[in-house]
Curated annotation (Swiss-Prot):
<dbReference type="Pfam" id="PF01966">
    <property type="entry name" value="HD"/>
</dbReference>
<keyword id="KW-0255">Endonuclease</keyword>
<keyword id="KW-0694">RNA-binding</keyword>
<feature type="domain" description="KH">
    <location>
        <begin position="158"/>
        <end position="218"/>
    </location>
</feature>
<dbReference type="GO" id="GO:0004521">
    <property type="term" value="F:RNA endonuclease activity"/>
</dbReference>
<dbReference type="InterPro" id="IPR006674">
    <property type="entry name" value="HD_domain"/>
</dbReference>
<feature type="transmembrane region" description="Helical">
    <location>
        <begin position="4"/>
        <end position="24"/>
    </location>
</feature>
<keyword id="KW-0472">Membrane</keyword>
<dbReference type="GO" id="GO:0003723">
    <property type="term" value="F:RNA binding"/>
</dbReference>
<keyword id="KW-0540">Nuclease</keyword>
<dbReference type="InterPro" id="IPR006675">
    <property type="entry name" value="HDIG_dom"/>
</dbReference>
<keyword id="KW-0378">Hydrolase</keyword>
<comment type="function">
    <text>Endoribonuclease that initiates mRNA decay.</text>
</comment>
<keyword id="KW-1003">Cell membrane</keyword>
<dbReference type="InterPro" id="IPR036612">
    <property type="entry name" value="KH_dom_type_1_sf"/>
</dbReference>
<dbReference type="InterPro" id="IPR017705">
    <property type="entry name" value="Ribonuclease_Y"/>
</dbReference>
<protein>
    <recommendedName>
        <fullName>Ribonuclease Y</fullName>
        <ecNumber>3.1.-.-</ecNumber>
    </recommendedName>
</protein>
Length: 473
């Protein structure tokens, strides 16, 4: 009986085993299979997961790189600390055998390594303070120099007046039908202004050399009271010859007495003398050059460079203006030509060329001349732009006329409103005279500098015949 019960129990257990266990196994395997084969339902979701995975991998790589950099930085710092410790140890070990100077040097090197950044910052600060101090010092030098040389300003004009006490002389100056006046204007290249209401005679021209010669001639005519055509022509001829001697003496006096130079060739004296009769922007060139030379000399002494060289370079910087209006060169090119003609020093060449930025200053004197030239020209009222513009137009008009064959001379008078052209009667016939006037008119109208100005052109052709008779004693 007991065996039967046991058998029944075993049978029940066997049935349960063969029915339940397979079911459990199937369920388990299905669940396992679902986990292993799970994929997103859509392709877009799958791509997002892949991209997210890549992003996470990149972030992980960046973190690893930063971690490596930090490790390297820490390693470098540790090496520097070890080096400092070692240097300290070596310094302490060697301190007993070092002299005071050696110990000082070792300590300085040690501190320099340790405080390298702080030293760089301190250097930058000191440099900034030094530059500010330099700028203030330079300003003080310029202000002090200008205060010491502040001179009364004289601006040259194109009109010179001569007093006439005897009113009867005015009639003689004008002459019958205005002949004396016309000859004076033609010979002198000036505009003669005779006002019946005023006790003066005015001589007007932007060319200071012509004005000076005409002034001397007029003064001699007034003093002698002997005024006729022949005497006017003779005096102009004489004064032109004397003028070259006069400018030589002026130049010599300026060089030796005013400037104190005794090592210049005498040939350059005439050019220096002509500076007295040349203006630029209404400013007299000789006065300007002397002023600039004095500026340069004073500043040179303050900054410890050769004051004589500075003075020479500054004085000659505008020497070209004595001939630029007689040639096609600008005043820098003309100045360099004069300087080389008389073998002046190289630093003077550089000062002439660089003061208007033709070249870069290659000497301290060239740089100094640029500064002092600006100082002199920048003084309030020192220059008058309209004057120089007027002079440029006059020069251009006269230059155009002189290019034509048969023209003896050309002068601008009547304050720039009239161009008087004197022709050679042997070269220009009466028929050619009108054609010449037309050609001059066209040339003026084609010039951009002169297009906005109305100018009257007067051509003068005069033929004189002089016959001497036998003197009967």
């Amino acid at each position: 009986m007991g065996y039967l019960i046991a058998f029944i129990i075993l049978l029940i257990l066997f049935v349960l085993l063969i029915t339940i266990v397979p079911v459990v196994m199937v369920v388990y395997l299905k669940k396992k299979q679902l986990k292993l084969t799970f994929v997103p339902k859509s392709q877009t979701s799958f791509k997002k997961i892949v991209q997210k995975t890549k992003d996470l991998e990149e972030e992980c790589e960046d973190l690893n790189n930063k971690n490596n950099e930090l490790k390297k930085a820490i390693s470098d710092q540790n090496l520097q600390i070890d080096l400092l410790k070692k240097n300290n140890e070596n310094f302490l070990l060697n301190a007993t055998s070092l002299t005071a100077e050696q110990a000082k040097k070792e300590l300085f090197n040690l501190l320099k390594i340790k405080f390298k950044k702080e030293l760089a910052q301190e250097y930058a600060k000191i440099k900034h303070e030094f530059n500010e101090a330099q700028e203030i010092y330079a300003q003080n030098i310029l202000v002090e120099t200008m205060e010491q040389i502040a001179e009364p300003l004289i601006v040259e004009r194109s009109l010179f007046n001569i007093d006439i006490i005897d009113e009867n002389l005015k009639g003689k100056i004008i002459g019958r039908d205005g002949r004396n006046k016309a000859v004076f204007e033609n010979e002198g290249g000036v505009d003669l202004i005779v006002d019946r209401q005023q006790p003066i005679v005015g001589i007007s021209t932007p060319n200071p050399i012509r004005r000076e010669i005409a002034r001397i001639v007029m003064q001699k005519l007034i003093d002698s009271k002997n005024i006729d055509i022949n005497r006017i022509e003779l005096l102009f001829k004489e004064e032109r010859e004397k003028f070259e001697k006069k400018v030589f003496e002026i130049g010599k006096n300026v060089v030796e007495q005013t400037l104190g130079f005794f090592d210049l060739p005498e040939g350059i004296y005439s050019y220096i003398g002509r500076m007295k009769f040349r203006n630029s922007y209404g400013q007299n060139i000789l006065s300007h050059s002397l002023e600039v030379a004095e500026y340069a000399e004073r500043i040179a002494k303050l900054i410890n460079i050769d004051p004589i060289k500075a003075k020479k370079a500054a004085f000659f910087h505008d020497i070209g203006k004595t001939i630029d209006f007689e040639s096609d060169l600008d005043h820098v090119e003309a100045g360099l030509l004069i300087a080389k003609k008389f073998n002046l020093d190289d630093y003077i060449y550089n000062a002439i060329e660089s003061h208007h930025n033709k070249v870069i200053p290659t000497t301290i004197y060239g740089a100094l001349v640029k500064i002092v030239d600006t100082l002199s020209a920048a003084r309030p009222g020192a220059r008058v732009n309209s004057y120089d513009e007027y002079y440029s137009r006059v020069k251009e008009l006269e230059t155009i006329c002189m290019r034509f064959e048969g023209v003896k001379s050309a002068y601008v008078i009547k304050s720039g409103r009239q161009l008087r052209v004197i022709v050679d009667s042997n070269l220009v016939s009466d028929e050619q005279l009108e054609l010449l006037g037309h050609e001059i008119k066209v040339a003026i109208e084609e010039n951009d500098l002169l297009t906005n100005y109305k100018i009257k052109i007067v051509l003068i052709k005069e033929k004189r015949i002089s016959i001497d008779t036998n003197i009967i004693g």
